[in-house]
UniProtKB/Swiss-Prot annotation:
The protein's name: Histidinol dehydrogenase homolog 1
PANTHER family to which the protein is assigned, alphabetical: HISTIDINOL DEHYDROGENASE, HISTIDINOL DEHYDROGENASE HDH
Listed GO CC annotations: cytosol
Protein family according to the UniProt entry: Belongs to the histidinol dehydrogenase family.
Source organism per UniProt: Mesorhizobium japonicum (strain LMG 29417 / CECT 9101 / MAFF 303099)
EC number: 1.1.-.-
Cofactor(s) needed for function: Zn(2+)
NCBIfam families assigned: hisD
The keyword Ribosomal protein belongs to this UniProt entry's keyword annotation: no
Lineage: Bacteria, Pseudomonadati, Pseudomonadota, Alphaproteobacteria, Hyphomicrobiales
């Protein structure tokens, strides 16, 4: 992709933080300088944020041999707009009311795919597994081993609990697997078989009793590699269904598909909106929007590495934000140059370039404290840390989907093979939740028992008075009757129990 004429506009977000965001023109109305005629020249404009930028002359520095790109044109919008919500709700209603007939109609309409039954037979599944080359099967097995091993290690940390909190009072909890889980694996544009590992395998390790999976056809046929991954991960039922109709079929059930209790897995905006609308009818893993990547780097790495990692995630989609936070201006400018170079050779440049053009951002800070603060503010899905002391960010950051520490690892490793789950929070949801993991498929359910009459009377005494403080007479009487029966005390109906 040829470099676009333009400049980088740098309004400081704080006294020290400096943000480099692509701009096609300077926002300072008093500045008439244009740079489009010199595509290898980058102008860095510094404007006092405490004054009206339109009334202040620009300070300019020219740095040679740096490519420039266009401005960020907006922010990613997650969640459906009114039209999308209405359209998705209509499709959900069709499946709820029409069952298998509606599922078939929608599959033909959207995927041009028709079958008598969308559930694959054992023979079809075996054929998909057998279609793998030896190398492909070994690679799939290796990836699934890593994901299974880490999920099993996580599961081992989730212990049931039982404790005697007072003499004769026993409290506890059990981690109970969700019984029926539906896993969605996207595959319309790319056959994202890694999502089969991340959802099906994790649910299997959690101990879910029934795991069904849906994936759309790929290029008009059953997506063989996805089906193989689903089967090897341990799916009990595999359906060649995509989009809203797949999510609806799993949530509502049809004549031939028993409903599930939870739906997990990423998808496009319509799939995400369907999950949002169905939340409450079924559980979901999280609301997933466009892929986000944040690279935090200093001058211990070079621009080629940073640019490669930014574009490697930007190719997910034209609305995938890719951000660099650095304390090295040289690295920032080198990264811009490398992005320009790589976009001339990257096969997915059409997508990655659009994402970088519209949602790319570089934030230049002076201290690691500022870098941490900016990263926590962004609360990005993926945060890759390539600094001299990456553990500083591990110990300091609070808002992120997953951290990738050091230059030896990267987000792609997490997406495909290293073992951590790639289904992660987006749109700043990392402020309040982590990503998909084995614990998402478990319900931590509490229980209690009282072993002695004395303990029942003691708890009943407090329960009686506390209930009446809130005005709940029936609650109080539940306590009182036990104080009478197990404590031998004469307590009037709906009266508080006097302390001994």
């Amino acid at each position: 992709m040829p470099p676009a004429g333009g400049i980088f506009h740098r309004p400081p977000t704080t006294r020290k933080s400096r943000r480099l965001t692509p701009r096609s023109a300077c926002s300072n109305s008093t500045c008439s300088r244009t740079w489009g005629e010199q595509p290898w020249l980058l102008a860095l404009h510094s404007i006092d944020s405490d004054r009206n930028a339109g009334r202040r002359p620009c300070k300019r520095r020219a740095i040679a041999m740096i490519r420039t790109i266009k401005s960020a044109r907006g922010s990613v919008v997650n969640g459906g707009n009114g039209a999308m919500t209405s359209a998705v709700q209509t499709l959900l209603d069709q499946v709820e009311q029409g069952g298998d007939r509606a599922v078939r109609e929608l599959s033909i309409r959207f995927d041009k795919f028709d079958r008598d039954s969308y559930r694959l037979t054992k023979a079809e599944i075996d054929a998909c597994i057998n279609s793998l080359t030896g190398r492909e099967r070994e690679d799939l097995d290796f990836a699934q081993d890593q994901i299974r091993n880490f999920a099993e290690a996580q599961r081992a940390t989730l212990l049931d609990l039982e404790i005697e909190t007072l003499p004769g009072v026993v409290l506890g909890h059990r981690n109970v697997p969700i019984q029926n889980v539906g896993c969605y694996v996207p595959g319309g544009k790319y056959p994202l078989l890694a999502s089969a590992h991340m959802t099906v395998l994790t649910a299997r390790v959690a101990g879910c009793e029934r795991i069904i999976t849906c994936a759309p056809p790929f290029q008009g046929k059953v997506a063989e590699k996805i089906v193989a991954a689903q089967a090897l991960a341990g799916a009990d039922e595999i359906y060649c269904l995509g989009g809203v109709q797949a999510i609806a079929a799993m949530a509502y059930g049809t004549e031939t598909i028993a409903p599930v209790d939870m739906v997990a897995g990423p998808g496009n905006a319509y799939v995400a909106e369907a999950k949002r609308l169905l939340f409450g009818k079924v559980g979901i893993d999280l609301f997933a929007g466009p892929t986000e990547t944040l690279v935090i780097a200093d001058d211990s790495v070079d621009g080629e590495l940073v640019a490669t990692d930014l574009l490697g995630q930007a190719e997910h989609g034209v609305n995938s934000p890719a951000v660099l936070i650095t304390n090295s201006e040289k690295l920032a400018l080198d990264t811009v140059a490398e992005i320009g170079r790589l976009l001339t050779i990257l096969p997915t440049a059409a997508i990655a370039a659009k994402a970088w053009e519209d949602f790319g951002e570089i934030i230049l800070c002076e201290t690691t404290k500022e870098m941490v603060a900016e990263a926590d503010r962004l609360a990005s899905e993926h945060v890759q840390v390539m600094t001299r002391d990456p553990d500083h960010f591990l110990n300091s950051m609070r808002n992120y989907g997953a951290l990738f520490l050091g230059a030896r690892t990267n987000v792609s490793f997490g997406d495909k093979v290293i073992g951590t789950n790639h289904t992660l929070p987006t749109n700043k949801a990392a402020r309040y939740t982590g990503g998909l993991w084995v614990g998402k498929f478990l319900k931590t359910c509490t229980y209690q028992r009282i072993l002695t009459d004395e303990a029942s009377a003691l708890i009943g005494e407090y329960g009686s008075r506390l209930s009446l403080m809130e005005g709940f007479v029936g609650h109080a009487e539940q306590s009182n009757i036990r104080v009478r029966r197990y404590g031998g005390r004469n307590v009037g109906y709906a009266m508080p129990v006097d302390p001994r």
